[in-house]
Amino acid sequence: MFDTTLLILLGLAALGFISHNTTVAISILVLIIVRVTPLNAFFPWVEKQGLTVGIIILTIGVMAPIASGTLPPSTLIHSFMNWKSLLAIAVGVFVSWLGGRGVSLMGSQPHLVAGLLVGTVLGVALFRGVPVGPLIAAGIISLFIGKS
């Protein structure tokens, strides 16, 4: 029996390797291993909770310099006195808002998810992006199509 999904995953993993993007390659290889082993029973949990777990891990990585003391409190306080830092704060708020709209849109219009996923994988593999794209992309789409 021919497994088209496995072939697509292998192609995307190859794209990750060709573009020297180990994040994509490793992620897809892990999914392939899960798919072809008894671990595939965990897919419903991964589909439901994977995004939340990923955001938690990403947030830990972003907050680690504050927690470790590498980013001292004085630097954090000074960020409110520099126009570039204030702009960064504003952009962070905007992008978080877009991500929230994106989560809502992905839940209400799941047919858009496939396009968002393909676009994100291509962006990560070909342009060295990071896979936070689907949420923000869905948020941007929500602005175009008027859904919140």
Curated annotation (Swiss-Prot):
Keywords: Cell membrane, Membrane, Transmembrane, Transmembrane helix. GO terms for cellular component: plasma membrane. The keyword Transmembrane helix applies. Belongs to the UPF0756 family. It comes from Klebsiella pneumoniae subsp. pneumoniae (strain ATCC 700721 / MGH 78578). This is UPF0756 membrane protein KPN78578_11500. It comes from the Bacteria. It is a multi-pass membrane protein. The chain crosses the membrane at residues 14-34, 51-71, 86-106, 121-141. It is found in: Cell membrane.
